Design a protein with these regions (language model features):
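Residues at or immediately flanking beta-strands
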Residues: 12, 38-40
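Extracytoplasmic/periplasmic substrate-recognition and gating elements
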Residues: 186, 216-225
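Histidine- and/or cysteine-centered catalytic micro-motif in compact active-site loops
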Residues: 144, 188, 205-209, 225
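Extracytoplasmic ligand-binding site segments that recognize negatively charged/polar headgroups
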Residues: 14-25, 44-48, 54, 61-199
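Short, low-complexity disordered leader/linker segments with a strong preference
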Residues: 1-13
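A ligand-binding cleft/hinge motif common to bilobed small-molecule-binding domains
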Residues: 71-76, 196-220
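Short, polar/charged alpha-helical segment
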Residues: 17-38, 214
């Protein structure tokens, strides 16, 4: 984000982030230790954070948006200051900062997270399986307009079903959300936490927090998309 407190010469850095607790806990303390900076971390979904940055455009509070949807960043180009990391030259070409204001920091795949205590004999191996009537009202997803992980799933399923311009692909999206039955989680974290807690059978999520739940012994498994 443009010109927050640290940019004005203070010793604090304000970071807005939709990233998982695991990633933030692994990076923020080490960053503070290495650079002697005190971080004020504000966590919310990508859409909520971008809206906040929009409202603060004339008096920015945040210094950095750490994580989120590239599409939302591209469509709000006026919110960001130009920045290209000195390490960009070491990044493989496909992931270099070519726009001048987005620095990629992680490759994190889309996954389905499945509650192994609830799934029974229902097959879940891909997007088509989510149309099973037995899963109606038992599928967790966030709003693609506000969640970067939900938006990633939307683009993935459209491509998997025929492409962005394909009527059958959009019909799949319609049918899926009919099966979701109006149960839209407020954030990405609500998806994987809801599945792990047994509120949902399956959720459309992303690798990092779901893998951590598996490592922590939660009754879940991951299906990579």
């Amino acid at each position: 984000a443009a010109s927050g407190t640290a940019a004005q010469g203070g010793g604090d850095l304000v970071i807005y982030s939709p990233n998982s607790e695991g990633l933030l806990n692994a990076t923020i303390p080490l960053f503070e230790e290495k650079y002697g900076v005190n971080v004020e971390l504000i966590q919310a979904g990508t859409g909520e954070l971008v809206k906040r940055i929009q409202s603060e455009k004339n008096d920015p509070y945040a210094d950095v948006l750490f994580g989120g949807s590239w599409s939302l960043m591209y469509t709000n180009e006026d919110l960001w200051e130009p920045y290209v990391s000195a390490n960009d030259a070491n990044v493989i070409d496909a992931y270099k900062n070519k726009c001048g204001f987005i620095t990629g920091n992680v490759l994190d795949g889309s996954v389905l997270i499945v509650n192994t205590d609830l799934i029974g004999d229902i097959k879940i191996e891909g997007y088509e399986d989510l149309l099973n009537p037995a899963l109606k009202g038992k599928i967790a997803t966030a709003d693609p307009a506000n969640s970067s992980s939900a938006f990633a799933h939307l683009t993935n399923m459209l491509l998997a079903m025929g492409g962005y311009e394909d009527d059958k692909a959009w019909q799949y999206v319609h049918d899926l959300f009919e099966n979701v039955d109006g149960k839209i989680c407020e954030s990405s974290s609500g998806v994987y936490k809801g599945v792990a807690d047994g509120e949902y059978v399956v959720g459309l999520s992303y690798e990092d927090p779901c893998a951590q739940l598996v490592l922590d012994g939660a009754p879940v498994k991951i299906v990579y998309m």
